[in-house]
Amino acid sequence: MALGVIILLGQQFFLSRKSMSPRRSIQQVYDSQVIEVTPTDNKTFVLREFKKWIVVDALTTPCDDVAGFMQNDQWAVVVVTESPVDLQTCNSPGCILFTWEMCKRDLGRLETVQALTQPSTLCGYLLAMVNGAKVIADASCDVPIRDMENTFEVSEDKSSGLWYNTTSAFNPFEHWGLTNTYPHEYELLNMSAPSVNSHVMYVSDLSSMTIKQGVAISKKTCVTNLYNPEKSSLMPVNSPVAIGANTLVSLQTGPTIFTYDSFPSMLLPRSETRDQMLFRTLLIHVLKKMKVVNFAYYKVDPKTPSKCDVHESAGDKDQSFVLQCVNSIECDANVWDETCLRNTVLGVLECLNLGSEAWLLNAWMTDLDFIGFKGSYEKASEPTRNLFGISYNFNKEFMMMQNNSELARVEQHITKNFSRICSSPLKQSMWEPVITDILLVVIINYETLYSTIPYMEYVHRRYFKYIMYCGPSLDSFVKYSDQADLGHVTFVSGMTRSWLFMYECVTHAMKLRLPVKGYMQMGEDVLVNTWLLASLPKDQIWIPGGFTKRDMYKINKLEKWYHWNSPVGQRGVINAFATLTNSSVSVPDGTSRAFALKSHYFAKRFLSNYKSNLGVNYIIHRATDLFYIPDVLRDDYIMASELFRQHETMIEIALPVIHYGLSNRKNVTYLKGASLWAQDRLRPWTYYHDTGIHFVHPVKLKMVTNSTEGKDFICETYLSKYVKESDVLRLKL
């Protein structure tokens, strides 16, 4: 066969609605009779083979290169242009130029095309739909991205990330580190001030998003203030942000992924570009309020860098009243249906004084029915599982590192706080951390220990670029951080039952998807020789050695170790292994097929590793207040930790067991440390060495520094070595 496009209703194949059975869609006609056009390169191309399409708008932004959209041959690329252009990069079997004349010729019997008076990207959408598209990416040439598939996680049915449901509007540019930048629609709606984000969010497992919105910097996507310019760069954090029902979002921040059920919402009115995008933003806002669609932002990396538009003031066309209008739109139907959708679209058109476009709406809905669209009108669900509150301030930290005066202020503030412990502390230096590829997770067991955070900041910011704290109460932390002026600190609530399940803190950290090679968790009372850890292999697990081995199934009512016979001990680990065994031999029912298969293969890997390391009838346990998980094991660790947490297995059992299930023990780095008990805890300096061990635990700061000897140890011995070694490491960078 030859490369070409399917002629829908050309001279060779005339299709009449009257002569067509109501049950026979256009796609079915294609299946029975496909007519192809042969272009000059004679390559085979049948559009209906593709289920995922990228529609590139070359009408509002001229296109000279679409190579950035063609990284994956599973996507068809249709470039919508007004007239033929010389586009050399659109030369593969998966790319086609679709001109206005081709649209009228090939789709001219569709009522939407008849209603159009000028070229429109609706032509590209319809071409994709009639050829059986299940996913459509709406893109433009000013933001060509490298990897559509992985950036938007199109192949996954679930993803992890953040859920935002706090303020009336969400500014994605602010979330990714730009305080004076906002989407074009917010300028039109005079909403630059109300779009200030809250830092309180939730770490969550996100359901499949109906609409996925890319966020990238370009003149088409954002506006920045002339009087307060900032660097046009987004912080390198990839976690998607799902938006709650009542929060306004922008559809003008980059490419948009529409899944099949959201195809009706792709309608654009015949109007100027900014009114088109404002219409789409407001329509999605109403549909989201009615819980018909769910929505998430994804940071995308354009192939070529760009900048925002710079404006002296807010937009000259203040339409803030429009938002009040659309917020009043309601649907009285108990069940969402096509009639409800029509009335909602009509309501948004009326709010924008575009009521004359009602005919286009009727044409669009008629064509969707004619094409054979069978989307679901069921209401979309918001995240409800595994919600853990987070005070998310990585963006503030990112901005602080680019602002010398703010950085100096925070450094001075932290140093001053630390002077309460050490009378003459060295000035804190946060400007050039030596470890930039590890996220440090610091455990704060009790609310009363939040006062140790300034000490943690003073010590660990010298080494680590990324730090997150995990403790029992988000509300208490926010109150404390406001009082202590620690607005750059990120904190997640993960201690739902004291310290017993604190291994889930790393799970939360992994779901944030920072650009790191691994995740190191430690308690606030662990004294660590970080300079010795910096050289360890970052593709291996690190965990303290020296485990106690025991028979998993042996019952001992006289057991001396209290936790073994408690609900978080033997019972929990036995139940976890029962689940693993069941999952390894069959695909579980009651979940999505993709997740069930993922669980099945994970269980097989876990049990295979565990059997070779120890044998499936035994477990090991020990205190694990310091450990590291490489990012290459991220997915397996998340599944393992959630499984053992589900069965309420405490950390001293769960983590040693998990590490044997994730990796062969030959590929594990076992840390050397001093674990202190009883009176030894009063004199930790007698067990400390700056070269032979990785850590000492516990070292209770307030208790140790109550004595002159203890204060000298912390302030003179330990910290002087800590600072010296950080400078040595920095010179090696």
Regions found by a protein language model. Give the residues of each.
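C-terminal catalytic/acceptor-binding lobe
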Residues: 2-12, 25-37, 43-44, 190, ...
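N-terminal anchoring/stem segment of glycosyltransferases
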Residues: 11-12, 16-103, 379-518
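Basic/polar, acidic-poor N-terminal "presequence/leader" segments
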Residues: 30-60, 181-214, 420-434, 439-441, ...
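Short, flexible loop/turn elements at secondary-structure junctions
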Residues: 58-60, 257-262, 444-446, 523-526, ...
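A short acidic (Asp/Glu
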Residues: 65-67, 88-90, 147-150, 267-268, ...
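Active-site-proximal specificity loops/subdomain of glycosyltransferases
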Residues: 85-133, 148-159, 469-555, 561
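Catalytic metal- and UDP-sugar-binding loop of GT-A-like glycosyltransferases, i.e.
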Residues: 137-141, 522
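Conserved donor-nucleotide/metal-binding helix-loop-beta segment in metal-dependent transferases, i.e.
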Residues: 143-193, 528-578
